[in-house]
Amino acid sequence: MLRGGRRGQLGWHSWAAGPGSLLAWLILASAGAAPCPDACCPHGSSGLRCTRDGALDSLHHLPGAENLTELYIENQQHLQHLELRDLRGLGELRNLTIVKSGLRFVAPDAFHFTPRLSRLNLSFNALESLSWKTVQGLSLQELVLSGNPLHCSCALRWLQRWEEEGLGGVPEQKLQCHGQGPLAHMPNASCGVPTLKVQVPNASVDVGDDVLLRCQVEGRGLEQAGWILTELEQSATVMKSGGLPSLGLTLANVTSDLNRKNVTCWAENDVGRAEVSVQVNVSFPASVQLHTAVEMHHWCIPFSVDGQPAPSLRWLFNGSVLNETSFIFTEFLEPAANETVRHGCLRLNQPTHVNNGNYTLLAANPFGQASASIMAAFMDNPFEFNPEDPIPVSFSPVDTNSTSGDPVEKKDETPFGVSVAVGLAVFACLFLSTLLLVLNKCGRRNKFGINRPAVLAPEDGLAMSLHFMTLGGSSLSPTEGKGSGLQGHIIENPQYFSDACVHHIKRRDIVLKWELGEGAFGKVFLAECHNLLPEQDKMLVAVKALKEASESARQDFQREAELLTMLQHQHIVRFFGVCTEGRPLLMVFEYMRHGDLNRFLRSHGPDAKLLAGGEDVAPGPLGLGQLLAVASQVAAGMVYLAGLHFVHRDLATRNCLVGQGLVVKIGDFGMSRDIYSTDYYRVGGRTMLPIRWMPPESILYRKFTTESDVWSFGVVLWEIFTYGKQPWYQLSNTEAIDCITQGRELERPRACPPEVYAIMRGCWQREPQQRHSIKDVHARLQALAQAPPVYLDVLG
């Protein structure tokens, strides 16, 4: 509240009427208006200064509080208490200064609504103590308490510890206890947090049993104690009993989900908080699940096993014991936190038809066993006969000069050599006929209805930003790439395009189902395509429809189709062909059911529930092994592009797609610049640059090479290990440009081992020639994926 408001002036109550009045004050202040005559006046763009003597007795109902980042208060002797309600609306507050005032008490929860507070100055007030709870949860860079009549007691032990550890600038203040000497010399032998001991059953319990836990609390000045039951509601019926110093907890009718769940007892006193966690072992029989084999780096037969104790595993192949080798072996993925279920793969390195058959996984523990079987086919039999059958032998006619007097019998009327010659002649005729048909088809005037130009103009928002790299890379002059900051003049190379024959699909074979999204080029649909592959009558595909029918758009469409036809790799999204019958023109791609990698990472990260908005989320974050597998697959696709001398220019997780079995492929359908518009920085009219993924030479000189792609891949690695966060998310585009060009690097993500961060930093060398090659990066990631490092997130 305010004291001593004046009448007849633009006082506190008048400019508190609304944000428009506050804006007027800010404009006047910036224009050099006369000094503010009231108790609190605007300071800077988002600050407030309250310095008139005795004008405040609380901070309740500060005007424009929701936008304040700095609050300075001085000479307010009537301001004696700081409580929760005083700072309720100051969610953006960073700096708070209350000096030379009458402040005597700060409530333990006073700063609950100011989580961004980083600097707190309460010097020269009347504070005798300050609870550790007051600063709990704040990331304070500076805490100033000098000039207060502090009373030395165990309640200030936390502040003494800050002084010992050099936190918050406390050591420089050399705090004094009123009449008792320096705070650093305060005796603290008896100042300890509570001591906890939780009694758990010695033996494991069975599903359906009841478990009684007891928490014994010891220590001085006990204030509160209790149980943390967040993870337990679905695992048992919970009943609490007792109170300090002995707390009881009954878990009735326990389920197998209780395994690996933390049961935590906590207690607090004026010194601090203590917690002790225990786990209860619930025994249950083994269970197993097998899934269809998927092709990743190697082939993988995914499985999930559960049981307590952990079951032993054994594989059978066609009913016989499968002996594991370096080519066929069991690999477990990183276990999810607080779960007994283990996920893994039976890895098969380059399996052939010999490995086709029935695979059975047996799992057993002392309480039971389980098995599951699945048929796997990795390759068709290349032989037309059974290799185990005897090979037929043709006998030559018996020599008439034989000494034997037996009659001679000829096996065939037609000599074998004549049969071979006739067969070869027929084969040659068929081959030449087929070749002539293909040449005639590809040599005719193309089905796009346009003639190919010798030099192609800059593209405008193609689905995949993949470009042929001319000698030494490519760069954009200021007049180039008006349609997109990522495109330059692409010179057609006969080595890559002269023999390209784009597959044409009949429109009647495409049945659109529903719209997946829309980009600058047009719309993308989920469709059902018939007669696309010989082994399937119909299959789901993604269809991109061209919005414009202009000549330049059709040329871009043709060039993109030819380019995509040339790209055939297991980690590049597969392009099936085009449909040019009628309008609009269509491109047909492989359908990746899980969408783009960025959304997939966010929905499988630690913040998935926060981002889901009530929808179902994945059971837990991706583990280290899975993150490494994702990164290695993206690197494999980039190795392939680099081998063809293609520069991507827009490599990011938003431009990668995820399919069944955690298969990741490079490529998008041109929607990323619309869906992820905040990832691009607009330069001029239409140019959009992904500056947060670009190296200094690309930002400053528009130079794009395979080395600039390596830099971008390092940023993609950072995205993967932050579960899809935007690089430099805390900075504006211009601030991010400054950081990149000045040599600053993204910080190591919490989920990232040092070995992976070393790879990132190798990708971010300022000199392009000093960066790792993408081939070397891929090899290192593959090695880490096969043997993930042991990494503990001590902060998580």
Swiss-Prot record:
Changing residue 577 to R: In CIPA; loss of function; processed as wild-type but shows significantly diminished autophosphorylation in both neuronal and non-neuronal cells. Disulfide bonds join 36-41, 40-50, 154-191, 215-265, 300-345. The record marks 398-399 as: Breakpoint for translocation to form TRK and TRK-T3. Pfam families: LRR_8, LRRCT_2, PK_Tyr_Ser-Thr, TrkA_TMD. Glycans are attached at residues 67, 95, 121, 188, 202, 253, 262, 281, 318, 323, 338, 358, 401. Isoform TrkA-I is found in most non-neuronal tissues. Isoform TrkA-II is primarily expressed in neuronal cells. TrkA-III is specifically expressed by pluripotent neural stem and neural crest progenitors. Belongs to the protein kinase superfamily. Tyr protein kinase family. Insulin receptor subfamily. Exists in a dynamic equilibrium between monomeric (low affinity) and dimeric (high affinity) structures. Homodimerization is induced by binding of a NGF dimer. Interacts with SQSTM1; bridges NTRK1 to NGFR. Forms a ternary complex with NGFR and KIDINS220; this complex is affected by the expression levels of KIDINS220 and an increase in KIDINS220 expression leads to a decreased association of NGFR and NTRK1. Interacts with SH2D1A; regulates NTRK1. Interacts (phosphorylated upon activation by NGF) with SHC1; mediates SHC1 phosphorylation and activation. This is High affinity nerve growth factor receptor. The lineage of its organism: Eukaryota, Metazoa, Chordata, Craniata, Vertebrata.
